[in-house]
């Protein structure tokens, strides 16, 4: 089955692929992503050349100085990527490929099988799933990415899909709730036949 990527997914995938191609030259960009809470942060200016190189569609640019929903979505996904990749030099030795990646919430569902983690994970997931505030969601997703890294550093997260979800989340209340339902299904639905990346 062929699944077509959206423009947001393609842009995110292209940026991450470019980061891999740059080898050691990406460390400043990854560090800036980790330190920046948003694209508006002064530290994020290091990221702008690469980000704006790929976000070229006229309709994705804001008419003023506000960040667009595309920029926020892609930047947040890249920030999660940078957080997960910190200290993983061996990970960047391989070509970036998201075909075998799982969504962020599917990766969390694998961790949820551990009863020691379940209650704390459920509380954090519920906080994300119950809000329509994009600022709260972006902060929580970075924290959840850190939890995945701490408990399964071999996990592969589909960052382009995450960026697309974040884009859709910002399109209004109903769209945000649809994304929350998608994430909830990925998190709570247990499929014992599907293997996690750590197996």
Describe every region a protein language model picked out.
Residues 149-199:
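Alpha-helical oligomerization segments
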Residues 9-61, 65, 76, 93:
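N-terminal domain-start signal
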Residues 1-7:
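Interaction-prone helical segments in low-complexity regions
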Residues 56, 60-110:
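Aromatic- and glycine-enriched beta-alpha-beta binding-site module
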């Amino acid at each position: 089955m062929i699944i077509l990527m959206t423009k947001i997914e393609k842009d995110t995938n292209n940026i991450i692929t470019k980061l891999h191609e740059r080898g050691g030259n990406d460390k400043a960009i990854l560090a800036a992503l980790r330190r920046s809470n948003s694209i508006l942060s002064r530290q994020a200016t290091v990221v702008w050349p690469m980000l704006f190189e790929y976000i070229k569609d006229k309709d994705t640019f804001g008419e003023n100085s506000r960040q667009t929903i595309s920029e926020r979505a892609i930047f947040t996904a890249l920030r999660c990527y940078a957080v997960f990749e910190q200290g993983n030099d061996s990970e960047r030795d391989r070509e970036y490929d998201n075909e075998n990646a799982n969504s962020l919430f599917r990766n969390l569902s694998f961790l949820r099988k551990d009863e020691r983690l379940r209650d704390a994970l459920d509380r954090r997931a519920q906080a994300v799933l119950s809000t329509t505030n994009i600022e709260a969601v972006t902060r929580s997703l970075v924290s959840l990415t850190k939890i995945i890294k701490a408990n399964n550093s071999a996990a592969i997260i589909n960052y382009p899909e995450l960026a697309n979800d974040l884009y859709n989340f910002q399109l209004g209340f109903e769209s945000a709730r649809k994304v929350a339902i998608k994430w909830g299904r990925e998190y709570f639905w247990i499929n014992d036949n599907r293997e996690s990346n750590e197996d």
